[in-house]
Amino acid sequence: MADEAKAKGNAAFSSGDFNSAVNHFTDAINLTPTNHVLFSNRSAAHASLNHYDEALSDAKKTVELKPDWGKGYSRLGAAHLGLNQFDEAVEAYSKGLEIDPSNEGLKSGLADAKASASRSRASAPNPFGDAFQGPEMWSKLTADPSTRGLLKQPDFVNMMKEIQRNPSNLNLYLQDQRVMQALGVLLNIQIRTQQAGDDMEIGEEEMAVPSRKEPEVEKKRKPEPEPEPEPEFGEEKQKKLKAQKEKELGNAAYKKKDFETAIQHYSTAMEIDDEDISYITNRAAVHLEMGKYDECIKDCDKAVERGRELRSDYKMVAKALTRKGTALGKMAKVSKDYEPVIQTYQKALTEHRNPETLKRLNEAERAKKELEQQEYYDPNIGDEEREKGNDFFKEQKYPDAVRHYTEAIKRNPKDPRAYSNRAACYTKLGAMPEGLKDAEKCIELDPTFLKGYSRKGAVQFFMKEYDNAMETYQKGLEHDPNNQELLDGVKRCVQQINKANRGDLTPEELKERQAKGMQDPEIQNILTDPVMRQVLSDLQENPAAAQKHMQNPMIMNKIQKLISSGIVQMK
């Protein structure tokens, strides 16, 4: 049940449904409250929802349960970063690296935490920070007619939440007139916002907080002519508009597959305005589409470097890293080539947890694993390892035999013989679930490989699942009706089933069989079926009705199942 909930949580997380992921991981935690991986996963889901307090709580629990696990400290550091607790984040990442010095995620996280801590110490406190604190902010914005309607706009609400979480983020949104309007309401002052057709942006002098008497003076003054835009502001805006125009022309050319023209426009935009890294990432996308992967990687590195200098949006930096990872993946030919791909995607995810990037990371890890298997594939060495395993098996050195059979499987994962032999070893060692899994793999690889049925039936017999073992042996006999090993297996199962039917089991055997039977979902369904409950009641109280029931083949099969499991005894 816990594994199922965990799997659902992972699937929801990969698809970007973080709320569902939290719910599924919570269900799994309720079933296995000491599983550190579940707390780690839920911490990541909370962080993706910007619920950093909850993410921190789960990360602390992860470290408490598994203090020697590097990923726990990665979660802890990420949560502290989200809460702008930069020194604590540095400490968490550093502790993680003491445990796992080669972990790229921890290295990248530590670098980001140190950079954030440095920026935090270097930047002056925001003078407007108090205006955005507490629930009073939302009350003021709701009460004022000029901002009430803005609260219906999701992007505006998200910006205000970001500013409330970290008042320093106000600098990122000062060009948004809605934010300026909200700032005026919160500070109880009148701030002139840019109207359509204005050529200048708000200067610093316009943001100075006036005295409380100034609004009254403004009303008494005669209207004055609009001041001429200061040249530096007008030129700056014109420059940005010109760069944006070049970007739009580049986008249009890109859509038409006119890549050379697109590159020219993006390059021109970069020359005009070097403070917007989207021009660089767009040019990188063109290089990627053209198959010029080295050029794409150079542009992505340039975008990341420039983005950090400008303190650009983390999402833009993450996009550049993701694009670089894609280019590296296109160039990968052997499994080792995927290592920088995976590292780059991991760095992108530390910047911004994006479902698409996570999907690409999973694909890269899967491709690396598949290539490793292909590169390791060698049937001749596989046969040698299997023979070594056989020698150890004969000497009853089963752990050594398992090791060689495992190596044989790695060298040739399509050979059912290695799985069959390892299943026999697991059976000898009492590791029945592992033995059953290997036996089923034998049958999956080659349905005509009779040893697979023999191994699976033997494991089920030792697990006292006699009905299941009987069914397995009979499936094998469909391929070879005269196979003596399978016939002997059927005979042993019949003896045990008849022993139960006659009531010859000892009290201990009966109790054990009943307990095992109650774990069988089929038995549970039979016992909860209203029709079968009536049948069982008639068997005890109404022999005539019971006789009619026995004429129904389906009911008879279910009764036989209950008898075999020891739940029902016929006397």
Curated annotation (Swiss-Prot):
Bias-annotated ranges (Basic and acidic residues): 211-225, 234-245
Cellular component annotations (GO), alphabetically ordered: cytosol; nucleus
Pfam name, any one: TPR_11
GO BP terms: chaperone-mediated protein complex assembly; response to cadmium ion
Phosphoserine modifications at: 168
Record region (Disordered): 117-137, 198-245
Annotated TPR repeat ranges: 2-35, 37-69, 70-103, 243-276, 278-310, 322-355, 382-415, 417-449, 450-483
Keyword Oxidoreductase recorded: no
PROSITE patterns, alphabetized: TPR, TPR_REGION
Keywords: Acetylation, Chaperone, Cytoplasm, Nucleus, Phosphoprotein, Repeat, Stress response, TPR repeat
Ranges annotated as biased composition (Acidic residues): 198-207
GO molecular function: Hsp90 protein binding; preprotein binding
Localisation per UniProt entry: Cytoplasm; Nucleus
Function: Mediates the association of the molecular chaperones HSP70 and HSP90. Mediates nuclear encoded chloroplast preproteins binding to HSP90 prior to chloroplastic sorting.
Note on domains (UniProt): The tetratricopeptide repeat (TPR) domain, forming a carboxylate clamp (CC), mediates interaction with the highly conserved 'EEVD' motif at the C-terminal ends of HSP90 and HSP70.
Quaternary assembly: Co-chaperone that forms a complex with HSP70 and HSP90 and preproteins (e.g. chloroplast preproteins).
Protein name according to UniProt: Hsp70-Hsp90 organizing protein 2
Source organism (scientific name): Arabidopsis thaliana (Mouse-ear cress)
Lineage of source species: Eukaryota, Viridiplantae, Streptophyta, Embryophyta, Tracheophyta
Designated gene of the protein: HOP2
